[in-house]
Amino acid sequence: MSDEQIKLVIVTGMSGAGKTVAIQSFEDLGYFTIDNMPPTLVPKFLELAAQSGDTSKIAMVVDMRSRLFFREINSILDSLEINDNINFKILFLDATDTELVSRYKETRRSHPLAADGRVLDGISLERELLAPLKSMSQNVVDTSELTPRQLRKVISKEFSNQDSQSSFRIEVMSFGFKYGIPLDADLVFDVRFLPNPYYKPELRDKTGLDTEVYDYVMSFDESDDFYDHLLALIKPILPGYQNEGKSVLTVAIGCTGGQHRSTAFAHRLSEDLKADWTVNESHRDKNKRKETVNRS
């Protein structure tokens, strides 16, 4: 059993107030997330999580979809209060009746408490039943005027144990066009216009991470010119992607085989961006040619 205290966030609130967006936001922040958790299973789940020691941050949606919600939630919260291994908070999402009705009309879904089909009646009953839980919540967020992106920013600011910049990650990868463009790439750049080290016998079996290849690739004026333009393009747009709520931006740089030119450029870009951002560097096809030769 781990001695580390489990950080638990119970996401609840009005139906239609944004709990789906919220739980996705917690997943982006590195939380283990569970949607529609029956209250009776919460203690057992937390016990297993503590025993495994693998999960230190958990966010779970507990709401009206569980029929025993109101009967069980108070006793569950009482048990959490006296558990020294659990540090829990309640995030209560709310919105005005007008906004909730509008959202239900837009999605054409029925309210879980609207027995006769009238959405407003269901909202009124739910608001009355949830009032005690709302009063116990440490975090109450009114989402009436928030876009999904804005709600994600609110949650990130409140519940991330890192600064907002480090919760946004940049994946810089090299690849070979002959093996296909990466499906998850957001930005793709082509460096096949540069001289190819493959045609230098002494460089053919090396990669862009080797000093000899890197220096060769970067020795040309067009390499420096292109890189300067590349960096000048990417740096100003990163805050925009971050502000839009994107958690990972994948920048892919390709050459013919992904072994020499693209690898050198991806490495250089990664090193320069690491001064200000969280960056992960990878080289998808760096060893593809060597593997192919060995199999033949």
Curated annotation (Swiss-Prot):
ATP binds at G13, M14, S15, G16, A17, G18, K19, T20. The keyword RNA-binding does not apply. Signal peptide: none annotated. GTP binds at D63, M64, R65, S66. One of its GO terms (molecular function) is ATP binding. Belongs to the RapZ-like family. Displays ATPase and GTPase activities. This is Nucleotide-binding protein SAG0531. It comes from Streptococcus agalactiae serotype V (strain ATCC BAA-611 / 2603 V/R).
